[in-house]
């Protein structure tokens, strides 16, 4: 074995389930890998990390674990035994890899992995992306050496060793936000993002919104509708005579290009989305997913809304009329558009990736 590889520091990263956990963790992994660290991932085989992590060149190990919230009685009764089994599986991975530090960034594997790390005497560092912590991180915060969070006041005051560091995001988005952007004087460019599965409420109302606004203003729309929704949403735009001004896509592979194109974004308010909007300096109309655990997306949205960088439209009151009204404000006042973008950039934490990586490195050195 190459002596440089064998002596380089090692980190086990636990993150999975959603892009909001996986992509920030990948940003940290890439940063540390460039510094010579050995990276190994702990996840579950049936979630997105199983595909994304190897695509980015990192080794991943799997354990068997599911969520425990909101399940039936029999599953809850079986849960303790399954958790114990998954802790044993995670400890086997740790014993094999011998990491210097463990970073937990959310997802099902983080709980058993964090407990196994504690039992193995390995320093555990947590990062919480949302404004309200998930159940796993709430529990692990009691045993972690350091608890990192994206937003202030995320954890209770009795949780020790908490530090606000922001959400790690891709470097190209940080660089995009550093460029001075002047909203176009012609058509208002509206980016609609509903996540990998799309947001049904946005898919339903946007065609009517565009049909109404196009009577008074020039606008173009890039609408990401989610898997298997493209034909239906495209037909809705066509029926209202709006197909020429709208680009309907199942997915947007290049979000940097989408953010660069857009004047304003209509979207959910997942933690990563909120952090990216701040970093690229774009105003937004935020429609929190109403069924998110502890309604954390509404709290996430408040980071931008309270700064004057976005508007909040709860799904319970959202309709074509009030969404069109908000977009009309942007269409009629490009100066307001620019000011809100500047305010968004003002709440961005641009060195989050380095801060998370440096803190992990500091605990690895302490051993």
UniProtKB/Swiss-Prot annotation:
It comes from the Bacteria. It is found in: Cell inner membrane. It is an enzyme of class 2 (transferase). Its EC number is 2.4.1.227. It is a peripheral membrane protein. UDP-N-acetyl-alpha-D-glucosamine binds at residues 18-20, 130, 170, 196, 252, 271-276, 297. Pathway: Cell wall biogenesis; peptidoglycan biosynthesis. This is UDP-N-acetylglucosamine--N-acetylmuramyl-(pentapeptide) pyrophosphoryl-undecaprenol N-acetylglucosamine transferase.
